[in-house]
A protein has these predicted regions:
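Glycine-rich, acidic/polar active-site loops that bind/position phosphate-bearing ligands
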Residues: 1-376
Length: 376
């Protein structure tokens, strides 16, 4: 509203990484500051820090992980650009989930990704082929929330750089083709106090009250904070029945049709949020989860019994927003978001999303040309 001013960038020396896939290159993540030294509230890292400070006042730490999927194509980025991103060839001709042959064909470049990330201080646990053609997932070890978010953004750059160096291209677009599964970013979270997972009652050997309230907050508030899980026009095309992405709010111990899947036990007991796509900004998505969960704890929100069945076909369950416009309106009306994230933050991201929706509304798509060229 006041034009484009300058900001200061303060390097976080704890975030320094030597990028082994780039010759003689180091990377440091910075925090945005105003000239008076105060944080830029709207900056994604500031948004997450604010929620982590709330946890810190209770001596609680959030441990998180993000599972990013991406599509690998045989064309380079320049070739994909010249082709208008049409008729691209995925690195596999069929779905490769739990298949051995096709992931093996991609192993030289996937191995390079694993090795270079680990050598650069981003420790990789594993990689596997996924449900769509040319789709892969490379999982990084969990860590405290801010470290995981930093790793996340560097990870995406690494995957694209290494694909480019190998004569290919990689895309994190949430939904590349309607007949294929989308690229997700499942987020795992647990809370620890004095080194113990407070989502688990170690005496009773079952989920704790803290877990139940945190999950209750996620179920109640995630729809109105969905913009932070799905920030693009394309993201909402991922929310389709039978697509491995959720469409409704529910939780279960092991059910991939729901929004929240509960996994592990004891110290590893955690919540998996299946809403975010690979376009999610990790700082904002992590902050939204923590804000929702803390509201659940503070309000002592109860969570319902674990859902059993196919959530895709159960119309009694609350639905996720179906478009960027709907998610933007929900965020704009969210009292929780304005209270705990801040009105400036909400106004900024609502404004940004509305500009994106406006840009798309004026675009003429291939679908329109095919549907209307001759028929009307």
């Amino acid at each position: 509203e006041r034009g484009f001013g300058d900001f200061e960038m303060r390097p976080d020396t704890k975030s320094v990484k030597i990028l082994t896939w780039q010759s003689g290159t180091a990377l440091v993540v910075c925090d945005y500051l105003h000239h008076d030294g105060s944080p830029v509230e709207e900056a994604p890292r500031s948004v997450l820090r604010k929620q982590l400070d709330r946890l810190g006042k209770q001596k609680i730490k959030a441990f998180m992980a993000s599972e990013l999927e991406f599509l690998l194509f045989d064309q380079t980025y320049s070739e994909a650009f010249d082709a208008g991103y049409q008729n691209l060839r995925p690195s596999s001709d069929y779905r490769i989930d739990y298949h051995i042959l096709q992931p093996g064909r991609d192993e030289s470049i996937i191995r390079t990704m694993r090795n270079e990330l680990t050598a650069s201080g981003i420790p990789v646990e594993c990689s596997k082929g996924e449900w769509s053609r040319g789709q892969h997932e490379v999982n990084v070890e969990y860590a405290e929330a801010l470290e995981t978010a930093d790793r996340h953004v560097i990870f995406k750059q690494a995957i694209k750089d290494i694909a480019h160096n190998g004569g290919k291209s990689a895309s994190f677009i949430p939904k590349f083709a309607e007949e294929e599964a989308g690229n997700s970013c499942h987020i795992h979270i647990s809370l620890q106090k004095n080194g113990k997972n407070i989502f688990w009652d170690f005496q009773k050997k079952k989920p704790s009250k803290t877990f139940q309230h945190f999950l209750g907050g996620l179920l109640k508030y995630s729809p109105e904070l969905c913009l932070f899980y799905a920030p693009s026009i394309n993201a909402y095309k991922r929310y389709q029945s039978g697509s491995w992405a959720p469409t409704r709010m529910a939780w279960s111990m092991d059910n991939r049709t729901v929004g929240f899947r509960i996994v592990g036990h004891g110290q590893s007991f955690r919540i998996e949020n299946r809403m975010p796509g690979a376009d999610a900004n990790p700082y904002l998505a992590f902050a939204a989860m923590i804000a929702s969960g803390l509201a659940g704890i503070e309000e002592k929100i109860s969570c319902p019994e674990a859902y059993e069945g196919n959530a895709y076909s159960d119309e009694s369950l609350p639905a996720l927003p179906s478009s960027l416009e709907q998610a933007t309106d929900l965020l704009n009306k969210s009292t929780l978001a304005k209270t705990v994230l801040g009105s400036k933050v909400v106004d900024f991201y609502v404004h940004t999303a509305r500009l994106e929706a406006k840009a798309f509304a004026s675009a003429v798509t291939d679908w329109e040309r095919k549907r209307y060229f001759e028929r009307i």
